Amino acid sequence: DEPLETCCAYANACGAFAVSRLLCSPEIPTFPELQFFLANGSPHHALRQDQAINHVHWATTRPASPPGIMALAIDHRIQLEAVAREVGAPFERISDFKVLAVQAAARVADGRQGFGMFIDGRYGREALFRAADHKLWVARPVELTGSRPLDFEYGGSLGTHLIEWPTAQVIKCLCFYHPDDPEELRLRQERELARVYDACRTLGRDLLIEIIAGKHGPLLDDTIPRVIQRIYDIGIKPDWWKLEPQKSATAWEAINESVARNDSYCRGVMVLGLEAPFADLVESFRACAGVPVVKGFAVGRTIHIDPARAWLAGKISDAEAVDQMAERFASLVSAWTDARRAKAA
């Protein structure tokens, strides 16, 4: 239905993409990508080097994802080691407990889309398999737990290790980053974030960047928006963000504006828990319920740390641990859905 001149422009542009990207038909541009190129052009003769266009290609060809995620996070390592040490349990039992957490999450999900888990590979290998059996959305950490400056679980090439991970697993990277950190620290952390971003894009994997700023400086209305803008400014566009609860609507509005302005294809923001009491989490859900870019939550220790302590100490059974975690997770799911429903009313 297009004029001949437009059809020729489409054909020539598609040919230029296919030749530049070397893989022919798999690299033909999507229609949004084609429109972006024809509207904006490119400063690169080799179109494969244009990161803005490459991002549109990635975002319009990546696998579909649920529009929102409610996740039980059990990727904690040093925290559960501390609990095991406290009650005199061997670290090996942490792996068994994480399998119980999958059972709890699967019970609450009950086969529905939009439920997920954060699970590590160190203690959660079997749990990762079980989560896949239940078709839960899964994010898996790549960072060395607790590291600041950011470091990774694996030495050498990140890509060499990440290529072994199932493609359905979202690669999650936690960075303790405050915009007022010393410049040397900030630049080092940014280099590491760029490494994992490059590895994810090269391998075709979703990347979730988790930012925790409040542990290393004041959490003001502009703190997280400044971090987000800086990460976008250095060319990193994660598929997901995971952020700590904000103290004001102003902060959430600034976060929403920054993400929307810099990456309209971002899948969204997930709110983390930081072991907050249940009532505090409910309030944090209400605070961000009407923010368009916020798409879910990921809460861990509020759900599992007390059952973990009791189970590792031999005070409760497997079934009791699953029941307790499922009850807490279900309560948070209800709080989240109620907050969203109330805001939409």
Model-derived segments and their meaning:
Residues 123-129, 179-199, 245-261, 278-281, ...:
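Active-site-adjacent beta->alpha loops and helix N-cap segments on the catalytic face
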Residues 135-138, 203-207, 217, 262-277:
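Short beta-strand/loop segments at the ligand-binding rim of alpha/beta enzyme cores
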Residues 46-181, 237, 267, 279-288, ...:
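Alpha/beta catalytic barrel-like cores
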Residues 1-36:
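Conserved post-catalytic alpha-helical subdomain immediately downstream of the catalytic base
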